[in-house]
Design a protein with these regions (language model features):
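Compact soluble domain cores
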Residues: 24-51
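Glycine-rich, flexible loop/turn motifs
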Residues: 1, 18, 41, 48-51, ...
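Short capping/connector residues at structural and topological boundaries
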Residues: 6, 18, 27, 47-50, ...
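A generic secondary-structure signal marking the coil-to-beta-strand transition
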Residues: 1, 32, 51, 61-63
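Arg/Lys-rich, positively charged N-terminal/basic patches that mediate binding to nucleic acids
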Residues: 1-32
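Enriched for short, Lys/Arg-rich terminal
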Residues: 53-56, 63-92
């Protein structure tokens, strides 16, 4: 089942649609989103390059995987699937 997205921009990137805001990271972000969809457990996302992290503070209960130094894909893991998936500028 495809993940539930937190916003339209992330959903468009996942579908391969050009989003100007994410044009520099679109290809890599789409690949990461595909990996998120394919995962059946959080352990599947434990690859070193993804840098899976449990978040703290105002994002407690969420996880993130790295797109690059600036952007992350943040999501919640519920009943074996990613929900509230969003691409986030980590430095804003």
């Amino acid at each position: 089942m495809p993940p539930r997205y937190a916003n339209k921009e992330t959903e468009l990137v996942a579908r391969g649609v050009h989003v100007k805001k994410f044009s520099a990271i679109a290809e890599r972000a789409e690949r990461r989103l595909d990996q998120l969809v394919a995962a059946t457990s959080l352990a599947d996302l434990g690859l070193p390059g993804l840098r899976l992290e449990a978040l703290k503070g105002d994002r407690q209960g969420q996880y993130s995987v790295r797109i690059n130094r600036q952007y992350r894909i943040c999501f919640e893991w519920v009943d074996g699937e990613a929900v509230n998936v969003e691409i986030v500028d980590y430095h804003n």
